[in-house]
Structures are given as C-alpha cells and as structure tokens.
C-alpha cells in the first residue's frame, strides 16, 4: 500500500528499485523462451528470401499497430514500402515516400537493427524528432528532441471530454528528468542481472512511467521493449509483433499500466501480464505469417520442377494474393512477354498440375493455383 499522499509509483521511497517474484514468473518465462525457439527454428528453415518477406510483414504490422494503440492510423502501403526500401527487400512498385511514416519506420528499424548499440539520450531525441518531423503533434506545437518542460502544467495521462477529464496518471516533474533518464539508461545498457525478456517488460514500464517527452512516449517505450527483445534473441529479424498483440488487448494494457503506476515497486503482476501478452503474440503470429509459410510449403512441394523466371514471378504474385483474375493477357503484361510466350508458360504449368483453369472459357478463361492436398 502507498503511504501518506504518495499516489504514484515514482513517489515511493524505494523508486526505482523494482521487485518481482521470480518463482511465480518462471513457468511463464519458460513457455515464452520455448515458443521463441520454436518460431525461430521454423523460420530459419524456410530460406533467406522468405525470411526477409516474413520480417517485412511483421515489421509493417508492428509499426502500424504501435501507432494504432495511440489512435493514429498510418497507410499500410506507405509503411511497407518504407521498410522495404530501407531493408532492400524487393516488393515491386514502391509507394512514394511519406516523411511522417519514414520517421516512425526509422525509429523501429534503429531499435531492432542496431540493438547492440547503447541506448542514449541523443538516440532517444533522434527517435522523438523522427516521430514528429513537423514539430507538431496534431495541431499542437511540442518540444522536439528534448525532454518536456511542463511549461503548461504537470504531464498527465487523461481521458474524457474537456472540463470533465479523468486523470489516470501523472508523471514525475520535468526538473527530475535528467536524473530519471540517466538512471534508466545506466540500467538498460549496463545491468544484466535480470533475464533479457524480463528486462524488456521492465524497460517498457520504466520508460512509459517516466514519460519524458511531450508526446510519443508509448511508441518509444514499445520500441525500447522491442530493442530489449531483439537483444534477447540476438537477431535483427522480427517474426512476431508485440505491439500488434498489445493493440488487441489495448484496454487490459492501459488498465494494467494504470494499476501498476499507482502501486508499489513490486511489479510481478505487470510482468506476468507482459509475459502472457508476449506469449500470445508469438503463438498468434501464424495468421500474419500464413502467406509466407504457404509460399514456403508451395515451393517445397514444387522444388524438383524446373521453371523459368517468368513462371516463378507470376506464381509468387498468385501466392502473395493476386488482385482480380489472372488471364493470359495479364500474364503477358506482367512478365513483359508476348501473348504466345505467356500461353506456353501457362500451358506448361497446367500440364504439370501447378495451375488449373477457371472461368467460362474463351477470353474469360483465367488461371489459379491448384489447391494443395
């Protein structure tokens, strides 16, 4: 219980000395580790190109969902193109750059691709500036690349209409931020006592509790958590999205944060929720990766069949979810070949049992993948 008028966790005398029951968390932590290992083993068995596609899908989902948690909806095609451009993944035509999307992507990629580098105040300032390239959050000008100064009052997390707002949390005053962040960064970069996955949960909670910026704290906290998880796995490729799972459990996420931030430094409940959410993220990634895994299975089944580059390109388009119906004229247009060559390519795949005909025949004849048994 809190004593006196100490409402928030950072007001406690023992702040920021986190405590948790390792024994209570051991079973869940073991499930998380085993699920991580199984997923990584499975992904390492599908080939480099498909792993890159899986990584692209997950990073795209991570960027989209981390922003959605804060009520911001980004263009999926812009996010996917921005990530593909930076990682050098071939996805066909790229959508024109959007500097706001590029900034969010830059932060997420810096956290996961450069996870071995120390996290510093300057690096955090860079992430914050990338999130708000115009210097505004909506219509409000905010301090960019600098800690908040509380010029308009204490930093509060509120909900409800103006005049009847409910205060869910109030962060430490601005004059404490240099010390607060210095303590956090020292722990994050140096202290290796806690399990790496536990550290991810603590880092997320600690940063969002300090709430050092005018805006963007949640997204940066989740990027820091992803950075810690990437360190735990020692891999720059991501095959599950914790942010996507948090978005699915958004109400529970905010309820657990509020309860923890108004509690003591004993944070086993928070870590139990975090580990459970992480486990559900790993176990639920099948849906997101279904297309990539289906492609892997398809090419495994047809590995012994010689195909030309045009056939491989068009089959991959079908596997990725071709919009509309694939006709011989569309084949010729996409593959940049003559109608006769397109028809020979298609006939060859029909004879081998890779494709089947559909449609009414004649000019309306179209082709699709033969269902795999």
Regions found by a protein language model. Name each.
Residues 1-373:
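FIC/Doc superfamily catalytic core
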